[in-house]
Amino acid sequence: MAYRKRGARREANLNNNDRMQEKNDEKQDSNKIQLSDKVLSKKEEVVTDSHEEVKITDEVKKSTKEESKQLLEVLKTKEEHQKEIQYEILQKTIPTFEPKETILRKLEDIKPELAKKQTKLFRIFEPKQLPIYRANGERELRNRWYWKLKKDTLPDGDYDVREYFLNLYDQVLTEMPDYLLLKDMAVENKNSRDAGKVVDSETASICDAIFQDEETEGAVRRFIAEMRQRVQADRNVVNYPSILHPIDYAFNEYFLQHQLVEPLNNDIIFNYIPERIRNDVNYILNMDRNLPSTARYIRPNLLQDRLNLHDNFESLWDTITTSNYILARSVVPDLKELVSTEAQIQKMSQDLQLEALTIQSETQFLTGINSQAANDCFKTLIAAMLSQRTMSLDFVTTNYMSLISGMWLLTVVPNDMFIRESLVACQLAIVNTIIYPAFGMQRMHYRNGDPQTPFQIAEQQIQNFQVANWLHFVNNNQFRQAVIDGVLNQVLNDNIRNGHVINQLMEALMQLSRQQFPTMPVDYKRSIQRGILLLSNRLGQLVDLTRLLAYNYETLMACITMNMQHVQTLTTEKLQLTSVTSLCMLIGNATVIPSPQTLFHYYNVNVNFHSNYNERINDAVAIITAANRLNLYQKKMKAIVEDFLKRLYIFDVSRVPDDQMYRLRDRLRLLPVEIRRLDIFNLILMNMDQIERASDKIAQGVIIAYRDMHLERDEMYGYVNIARNLEGFQQINLEELMRSGDYAQITNMLLNNQPVALVGALPFITDSSVISLIAKLDATVFAQIVKLRKVDTLKPILYKINSDSNDFYLVANYDWVPTSTTKVYKQVPQQFDFRNSMHMLTSNLTFTVYSDLLAFVSADTVEPINAVAFDNMRIMNEL
């Protein structure tokens, strides 16, 4: 049906064209005379190139009507051409993924994370004073110190507690310092005899509180007075006293032992510069030799892409290549000293006016030629190859000059860089417009979906050696993959790098221009020959342009740190063939090469993004592994993956398809956990009980009995229904009970007068009013489980009677022994012991961390005119 409709539309267009033709028959003769007068006129017309556009002078403005008619013809021809191409080639519909402008920023806008420098020690615990109660519930005057959580936010429920530990792990990963300098966080010990220092302000405040506590032993006070730093200047080492919970000490000691900083010297800076830049004779590099012995740096994490984002992650790959493309365009140098557009157009006009009457199609040869388009084309080609962005070609078949320029483009840029449909359309236009008519061959009727391209078909049918040889080169023009300094690079063919392939192209073009075009009118043959002549007149400049393109591409490619994987992108970079014509016709003889500052900037941005990318992968892998080991079966892995992508900054996470998210999750699961992150997780895993028992928010379970149990004395609370151990009780895990929903076992045990312990994280609720407690105690616990069967609403109440309680007089006056059918199981927090909490921490006395290693390198270039390519010959030889 599609073909039938298109055919009908073409017939309608042809009928309209016939009617217009009849109306314009009378005017054609006069138009031809006016056009011939204009072409043969010797009167000079001045063309300027202000604002990068060709402006038309007063002389030309007089014939605006004539030009508008010509423009109508051009537009009509272009429209017919587009319909023809659509008729011959069914356009393949591909999914589009347009990143939002607000999300997609240049990679250079993403600032590298500064080395995380900790200004205080990592702490989970802090010591707190709690009162002591006598056997009768009265409060004593003395206190006791216990380790409690600094930030007590533990939720109730075993699953939620495990999720809390995952969040704690994530927090530790975020805060984990790259290096520690204890000197920067040390503060004065107010109680020191000789103005000594302790490791941080919290240690100092703990020392103050203990020193002022009346119950502190004299020996401890004397020890605090002696607490000070110990410096070993010859070894650049300093020891500071600290007061830390054993778990906090384990964390901080691990951070100190596994710092990421490494000594920095000139060799490291020298090797940090990409080898090809170091060995490039066009760049003169000097290094500052005055590095102090305390200089340090953090080695960037440049592991190659472990996720293979190019494989089945179309949306992600499109975004990352687009970001790379935007960055690459900003570092490609601007072309200088281009041929004056005015002078070049005048020269081209003279070449086109060698014979009497210029035919219609030749008037298009000059359209769109300007220096801005030339510069834009140069940047687009290099940036697309650097970022491996797929390009699509935009052209008009009747503009033979564009097609001839396209032949140069297809010669120097590998086929893979163009989207298949666009490549086929361009090749088909070149074959049917230039190559086949030259040899009198019939038009090629290309079938959509043919595995061979038009050039591959033409190569088998063309007998002329030079043309077939050129077609063979284009058909086999692919990137050569080479691993350089551990990075996969896409390298151009040597014949392109040295420009020799242009001679091959010119031989083919000259052969085509010598052919008779037997099936075409003479004017057609003349137009093609003139177009070829225009390009062949610039043979030397085209060789230089090709060498310049290859040199800039390879020099900038040396600064890329991630593997250059070649995969077709969802969206493409559009390239007008008229801009390729501008580049070919306007390229001058001025060499442009990237400045050293530009190269260093490009290299630093690539290193920063690559290193951040790997660190975020390590974080995501660690969190996923931790979630699995903590048995967080309800955890949404997609949320972890989304968080990972957000931390890379360049992705519009909400628009990434779900299938790619889950594929990313699966690949992250396969990666091993980085050793530092694994050790930190094991530290948390081993000490979960210690952290949990230091919380005042939750209890560890509840004991339920059918008959009342007496309240017992507890040093921390007075008379309470608290159990400190579960010996002698049958235990049932609350989480498993809630998941199974089978309460028969509990009911039977209680009816048989056997107390049962439900073990799990429960809210630790205190209610000091005895009167209110008596009324609701049994209902809140026993009734809910046995009757309502809702364990998730279980909130055991801590029944506490002491001298701080309003109801203490009940016990004192009436000798009443309170009882309860429940007991809250609460583990005892760790008691604070000064001797066990005093630790000496050791670090370097001083060092300086340098983030930008290339700041030590001063660089310059040779005079651009003397710049040489890989073959030790000048990049631009045509002077």
Curated annotation (Swiss-Prot):
Q: Which domain of life is it from?
A: Viruses
Principal place of residence: virion
Annotated Gene Ontology cellular components are: T=2 icosahedral viral capsid; viral inner capsid; viral nucleocapsid
Q: Does the keyword Coiled coil apply?
A: no
Keyword flag Ubl conjugation: yes
Q: Where is this site: Interaction with the intermediate capsid protein VP6?
A: A219, F223, M227, M838, M840
Ranges for the region named Hydrophobic are 393-413, 421-441
Query: What compartments host this protein?
Result: Virion
So what family is this one in? Belongs to the rotavirus VP2 family.
Cited function:
Inner capsid protein that self-assembles to form an icosahedral capsid with a T=2 symmetry, which consists of 120 copies of VP2, with channels at each of its five-fold vertices. This capsid constitutes the innermost concentric layer of the viral mature particle. It encapsidates the polymerase VP1, the capping enzyme VP3 and the genomic dsRNA, thereby defining the core.
Quaternary structure and interacting proteins, as annotated: Homodecamer; each decamer is made up of two conformers of VP2, called VP2A and VP2B. Interacts with a VP1-VP3 complex. Interacts with the intermediate capsid protein VP6. Interacts with NSP5. Interacts (via N-terminus) with NSP2.
| Name of the protein in question | Inner capsid protein VP2
Please give the organism: Rotavirus A (strain RVA/Human/Japan/S2/1980/G2P1B[4]) (RV-A)
The organism's lineage is: Viruses, Riboviria, Orthornavirae, Duplornaviricota, Resentoviricetes
